[in-house]
Amino acid sequence: MTAEQAINEGAFSLAASFGFVPLEYRGYEAEVLASKETAYIGTALNGAMSPIYDVTGPDALEFLRSVCINSFRGFQVGQIRHAVLCNDKGQILTDGVVARIDEDTYRTYWLAPALEYRLINSGLDVKGEDQSSNEFFFQLAGPRSLEVLEAAAHEDLHDIAFGRHRMSTIAGIPVRILRLGMAGGLAYEVHGAAADTETAYRAIWEAGQPFGLVKQGLNAYLMQHTEAGFPNINLHYPLPWYEDPDMAAFFDTRPTQNFYNKYRFFYGSVGPDAEARFVTPYQIGLGKMVDFNHDFIGKEALQREAEADHWAAVTLVWNEDDVADVVASKYRGRDVEPYDKIDDRPFDIYHNLGQPGFAYHADWVLADGERIGTSTGRINSVYYRRMISLGFIDKRHAAEGTELTVLWGRPGTPQKEIRVTVGRYPYFDLEKNNAIDVASIPRPALDVSAGA
């Protein structure tokens, strides 16, 4: 990918080893609001940045069941499933999406290289193939996203239900359209051959102009998960890839995919303890996915956790006066050491570390001074005009309206207890993708005069 391609036109980009990653086009505020008001097209996960891995063979489904917490019961061609892999401790090794694209072919997203490691050691009649550089990956979301896609495809796509996918064409190019997304509301993905990336992107972009389509960069994309209540790998928590020597040796052979967890930098009051940052499905609200009616790696540990019934995932709404005090600490003169910055980023993601690696931010959540969990994924919610984060906390303190504090600041620096209130979860309170009836949405493919 080059900076001259359509995806990068008008973008402020981050240079990565595999190409340019657009960070912002019109500014993250406008790009975030597009998911609520019109529609966006995003490429944050396009190209080599996203691990795409096919699992094929007679034992493909048996293999997936053996390594995932969900059983894939009733999983049909044309469906999509969320999948989570754990280690023996029940800690999440990765989570992502599986699309069944043929009888014995399952295309996975963000499950490799952990999935590949498990496959190589499975002893089953199953094969794996890396597709990461072979497929483009566009995300569209917002109330007019379906209209945009139909205008580009010249086809009625209303039949694609939530969690489903099927083939279509855009500009004469075969594409797979999936109905899912991280923004909370109506959302789709468009996948196709990497060689057709620019042609497909330009066709969608041009078709979307009458509907107010906005280009979305990585910064706006990273702000969606907290608001929509989707805890995400490499955003809300790191993965225990390098705590197992055999696994670590394997990941070292995948240098383009081990980036997020080989060289970790830890920010926030939780400090350098990686174990305090690793999570289980129950901590982050995914316990409902666990199916104990099949054997899988981590089952015994998760059974113990299910019995303990200790954790809850919540939204934390930050007190604006306490946040303002952290900002004000920068302006109290040279004799006062300020708190860690909270105002120079819309979230706690650090792009420019000056060295290889990836940064994770987590803060302790306190109840009457006692640690009850962690806060991660802090964002400035543009739509709701609040600062919020996700909390993985003791469920005894998880009732909406409960007042807690977040300890802000790295160990050894000035720290402040910021008041937070447990809010609704997810914080996104508009109509959700899985509940939207698209029947009332216009069909541009059937109306050549369609416009805004």
Curated annotation (Swiss-Prot):
InterPro entries: GCV_T_N, GcvT/YgfZ/DmdA, GcvT/YgfZ_C, TrmE/GcvT_dom1. GO terms for molecular function: transferase activity. It catalyses: (+)-sesamin + (6S)-5,6,7,8-tetrahydrofolyl-(gamma-L-Glu)(n) = (+)-sesamin monocatechol + (6R)-5,10-methylenetetrahydrofolyl-(gamma-L-Glu)(n); (+)-sesamin monocatechol + (6S)-5,6,7,8-tetrahydrofolyl-(gamma-L-Glu)(n) = (+)-sesamin dicatechol + (6R)-5,10-methylenetetrahydrofolyl-(gamma-L-Glu)(n). Induction: Expression is induced in the presence of sesamin. Optimum pH is 7.5-8.5. Changing residue 221 to A: Loss of activity. Optimum temperature is below 40 degrees Celsius. Belongs to the GcvT family. Converts sesamin into sesamin mono- and di-catechol. Catalyzes a ring cleavage to transfer the methylene group to tetrahydrofolate (THF). Also active with (+)-episesamin, (-)-asarinin, sesaminol, (+)-sesamolin and piperine. Homotrimer. This is Sesamin methylene transferase. It comes from Sinomonas sp. (strain No.22). The gene is sesA.
